[in-house]
């Protein structure tokens, strides 16, 4: 719980990755590009260090550094005066006045303004470099959208949110049904013709077999060798013919016995086949065998697979958002339970932050979904599929689980096929939901690992592709900023904005040690005399949000 | 490693770390010395806002140390081969891990399924011989009895076919199994890429259990490897880093994928005697989209099968590239339909208004958000506070103008970690 108590604990990469990264050296093809973008904050960390030609230059540089030191101190003391009145010691005031006389107010104010401009322009520049086109019509449309949104009611907003996704799902279903109809109309007549032809061939060979046996029996031949050779030859022929009928034309044992061909390409099985095509499962039983059927299968796949994958990915994103929301609530509940045992160590909030609506009970945690939780969800859903199929089909639980796993991973061997009758739609619903859950797992866990692995040992070209680890996910800074704006627009609460803002800004400022709360400012030496030196007092001196210092007896709990 | 160095490395993992920084981190310098290296050139004043520089003898000594280290490291820079090798090492290890996983899985599948397959051959051959004996003993029976026996023979055949056997497997005694090493490698490749032809599948319970466990760990490994290689190809396509991702590149990737399919279809038409061009193209499309019907699949020598495996992997890299270039944008746009804001419009609005902020001299994150969002009018969001780093021993470092009072500072400080 140490990370939760600090609130802003950042998720670092693994130690091994860090070591290997530090070992990385040398020849960077994008170094010129980095130097070209001097305004880019990424190049702030690229500089190898300061080089001084002589001690005189060193002295001048040290004098220049004071410009940024005095504004900070002056600004902090002014804020302190506003909050705590005239409690500041006299010698501190004299020190401030002396520095002000030395460098002048203009330098102080200019330095502060320049620093603030520099910090804020970084984020805007990083968004600017994301390469989005600057069109005047866009701003007009944006203004118009804002005017329309203010007039919309809650119901219309909800409809606007839901309808495009429902339309996408309906479009995919319609596309699948139309494809199934075409497969059925093309393949069904051809299938009947070929099956009847195969049955005719099989029964021709069977009749030859029977006639030869009867002829031998009528001749009263008693030689066993002649019997066996005749039987083997006919059985070989029959087996070969049966295998062709089984493998290519999907005849079954019952059809051969009754000499009656049943329909494999029914409308239901056509829908099942179309779904297994667009979801890339591909059982292969049945398959189109005519040229027209195969050409249509090629076109159907090229258009249908992207459409279906986008739809399932869309559903998967909704599922992942709900999972993140549920996990966040779980963390809040856990924090509430555990916080009862840590009342004595609650953090304090200074007056300034408290007046802006950030109380001490505000909890900020990074919601990183653990990988084993996502894997457990996947296995539980597969087991549920095993139970479902073992009830619908005469399969054992392990066979059903095996089929469910092969289907969820879209391997699709085709050795186990469910019946395609009344229960088919339940099976199709299970398959599509399972694929959405698989997409959710990839979205939550897989993407960050792919990005980390790909960018391992490499340098980032510019700020457009700069990465930030937020909430356990590796995202582009431009994407992060866009999502931040979306969140702020969606949630009108001021608290959310402030927290998100602080959260983002924490990743841009340079290194902050973990014991920042214990490090005193230079101008706080006088306060130390009035505060006890116990560790708890020092611990409670800093505000958890802005990390500013204040006196203990003025804390707000 | 120094404890601070871990945080430094973790924080800067997305940015460049130079040999000088590495050398200094390995020498256990203090945090202040680290940040000295990360400072910008003296000409940029804004870059110094987070640094407090002390004009004392101790500070001068530290700077001298830094200068010595800088001059020392620059004499022997490592370039060229070593850097490229270190860059590619992890990715090569990932590829070798995938290949080793495929080969090891193939070996285990042959171990599990080979004996089961031979047992299955033997049992069906025994059934076949018993059938011939029954047929001989019924030589004096009627036509109806003979037809019933033939129906029984048909049932035996179909049951054998469902278990993956062919007529030649059980009509004549067999000593070898179809689960050879190259067949197993082809099978494991199609499992891990989720193609799944289904022409050669595990039948025994042990084989199925192993297949489930094998796929749980193998499919993510293979997908990560293919996605990693696809990103390298995507990086090669980007000539200019500042170029916008346009529709032309998406079409280029799709045309490249279809071209690869067409060329491969021509090759398969030549190599497979029974396949026409349409059959070959059909097979390539069904394979590269990982549908994998299995009605058409390559059968041949070891070299031919290995070339087919390489074809599948290269094709999947191109397919993943197409998904990465075209699909991700489509999915993101589709998902954000109906949301509060379109991210593109937000970014464009910010860029349009950036010039106004610069002119007014009030460029700040909250100000930009307020104007772009137009929803917090009249509200004063809290300004983020930027503060400078102060080292642990700040109290022991005197100012230039306090040198006369150094003797009066005798108080000790207590620093306790949280």
Curated annotation (Swiss-Prot), chain A:
Glycosylation site positions: 220, 237
Domain of life according to the entry: Eukaryota
Cytoplasmic-side positions: 1-165, 316-368, 447-557
Membrane topology type: Multi-pass membrane protein
A Pfam family the protein falls into: Ion_trans_2
Annotated GO MF terms: outward rectifier potassium channel activity; potassium ion leak channel activity
Main location: membrane
InterPro entries: 2pore_dom_K_chnl, 2pore_dom_K_chnl_TASK, K_chnl_dom
PANTHER family reported in the protein's UniProt record: POTASSIUM CHANNEL, SUBFAMILY K, TWIK FAMILY OF POTASSIUM CHANNELS PROTEIN 7
Protein family membership: Belongs to the two pore domain potassium channel (TC 1.A.1.8) family.
Record-given protein name: TWiK family of potassium channels protein 7
Species of origin: Caenorhabditis elegans
Protein's gene: twk-7
């Amino acid at each position: 719980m140490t990370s939760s108590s600090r609130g802003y604990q950042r998720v670092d990469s693994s130690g091994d990755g860090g070591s290997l990264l530090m070992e990385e050296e040398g020849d960077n093809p994008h170094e010129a590009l980095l130097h070209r973008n001097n305004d880019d904050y990424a190049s702030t960390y690229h500089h190898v260090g300061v080089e001084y030609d002589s001690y005189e230059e060193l002295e001048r540089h040290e004098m220049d550094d004071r410009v940024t030191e005095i504004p900070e101190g002056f600004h902090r003391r002014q804020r302190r005066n506003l909050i705590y009145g005239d409690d500041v010691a006299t010698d501190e005031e004299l020190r401030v006045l002396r520095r002000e006389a030395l460098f002048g107010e203009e330098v102080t104010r200019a330095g502060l303004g320049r620093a603030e401009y520099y910090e804020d322009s970084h984020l805007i520049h990083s968004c600017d470099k994301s390469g989005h086109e600057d069109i005047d019509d866009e701003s007009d449309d944006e203004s118009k959208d804002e005017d329309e949104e203010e007039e919309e009611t809650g119901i219309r907003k909800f409809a606007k949110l839901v309808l495009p996704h429902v339309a996408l799902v309906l479009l995919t279903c319609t596309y699948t049904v139309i494809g199934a109809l075409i497969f059925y109309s093309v393949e069904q007549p051809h299938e009947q013709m070929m099956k009847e032809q195969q049955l005719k061939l099989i029964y021709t060979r069977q009749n030859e077999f029977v006639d030869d046996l009867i002829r031998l029996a009528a001749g009263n031949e008693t030689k066993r060798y002649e019997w066996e050779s005749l039987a083997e030859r006919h059985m070989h022929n029959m087996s070969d013919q049966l295998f062709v009928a089984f493998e290519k034309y999907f005849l079954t044992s019952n059809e051969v016995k009754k000499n009656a061909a049943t329909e494999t390409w029914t409308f239901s099985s056509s829908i099942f086949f179309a779904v297994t095509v667009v979801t890339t499962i591909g059982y292969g039983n049945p398959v189109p065998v005519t040229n027209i059927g195969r050409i249509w299968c090629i076109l159907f796949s090229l258009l249908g697979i992207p459409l279906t994958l986008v739809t399932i990915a869309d559903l998967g994103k909704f599922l992942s958002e709900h999972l993140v929301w549920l996990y966040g609530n779980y963390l809040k509940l856990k924090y509430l339970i555990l916080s009862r045992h840590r009342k004595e160590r609650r953090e304090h909030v200074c007056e300034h932050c408290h007046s802006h609506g950030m109380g001490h009970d505000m909890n900020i945690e990074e919601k990183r979904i653990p990988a084993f939780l996502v894997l457990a969800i996947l296995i539980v859903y597969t087991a549920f599929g095993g139970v479902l199929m073992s009830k619908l089909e005469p399969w054992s639980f392990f066979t059903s689980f095996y089929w469910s796993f092969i289907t969820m991973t879209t391997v699709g061997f085709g050795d186990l096929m469910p019946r395609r009758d009344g229960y088919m739609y339940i099976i199709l619903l299970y398959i599509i939901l399972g694929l959405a859950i698989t997409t959710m797992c990839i979205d939550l866990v897989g993407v960050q690992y792919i990005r980390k692995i790909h960018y391992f040992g490499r340098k980032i070209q510019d700020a457009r592709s700069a990465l930030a680890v937020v909430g356990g996910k590796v995202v582009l800074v431009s994407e992060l900023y866009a999502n931040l704006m979306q969140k702020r627009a969606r949630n009108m609460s001021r608290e959310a904005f402030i927290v998100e803002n602080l959260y983002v800004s924490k990743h841009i400022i340079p290194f902050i040690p973990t014991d920042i709360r214990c490090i005193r400012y230079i101008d706080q030496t006088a306060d130390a005399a009035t505060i006890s030196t116990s560790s708890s007092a020092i611990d409670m001196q800093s505000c958890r949000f802005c990390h500013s210092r204040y006196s203990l007896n003025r804390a707000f709990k | 490693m120094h404890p601070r160095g871990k945080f430094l490395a973790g924080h800067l993992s997305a940015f460049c770390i130079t040999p000088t920084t590495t050398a200094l981190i390995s020498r256990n310098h203090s945090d202040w010395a680290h940040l000295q290296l990360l400072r910008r050139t003296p000409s940029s004043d804004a870059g110094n806002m987070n640094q407090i520089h002390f004009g004392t003898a101790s500070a001068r000594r530290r700077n001298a140390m830094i200068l010595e280290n800088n001059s020392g490291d620059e004499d022997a820079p490592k370039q060229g081969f070593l850097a490229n090798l270190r860059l590619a090492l992890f990715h090569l290890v990932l590829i070798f891990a995938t290949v080793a996983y495929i080969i090891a899985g193939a070996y285990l599948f042959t171990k599990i399924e080979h004996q089961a397959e031979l047992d299955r051959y033997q049992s069906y051959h025994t059934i076949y011989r018993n059938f011939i004996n029954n047929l001989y003993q019924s030589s004096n029976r009627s036509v109806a009895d003979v037809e019933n026996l033939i129906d029984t023979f048909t049932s035996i055949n179909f049951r054998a076919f469902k278990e993956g056997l062919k007529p030649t497997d059980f009509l004549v005694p067999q000593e070898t199994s179809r689960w050879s090493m190259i067949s197993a490698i082809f099978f494991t490749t199609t499992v891990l890429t989720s193609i799944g032809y289904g022409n050669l599948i595990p039948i025994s319970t042990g084989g199925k259990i192993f297949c489930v466990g094998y796929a749980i760990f193998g499919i993510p490994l293979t997908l990560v490897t293919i996605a990693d290689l696809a990103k390298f190809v995507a990086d090669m396509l980007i000539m200019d880093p500042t170029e916008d991702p346009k529709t032309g590149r998406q079409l280029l990737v799709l045309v490249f994928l279809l071209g690869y399919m067409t060329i491969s279809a021509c090759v398969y038409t030549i190599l497979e005697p029974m396949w026409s061009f349409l059959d070959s193209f059909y097979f390539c499309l069904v394979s590269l989209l990982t549908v994998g019907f299995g009605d058409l699949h390559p059968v041949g020598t070891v070299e031919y099968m290995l070339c087919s495996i390489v074809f599948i992997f290269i094709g999947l890299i191109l397919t993943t590239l197409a998904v990465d270039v075209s699909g991700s944008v489509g999915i993101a746009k589709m998902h954000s339909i109906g949301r509060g804001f379109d991210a593109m419009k937000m970014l464009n609005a910010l860029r349009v208004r950036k010039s106004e902020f610069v002119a007014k001299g009030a460029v700040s994150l909250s100000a930009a958000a307020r104007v772009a969002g137009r929803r917090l009018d009249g509200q004063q969001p809290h300004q983020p506070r930027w503060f400078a780093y102060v080292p642990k021993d700040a109290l022991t470092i005197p100012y230039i103008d306090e040198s006369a009072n150094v003797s009066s500072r005798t108080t000790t400080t207590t620093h306790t970690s949280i």
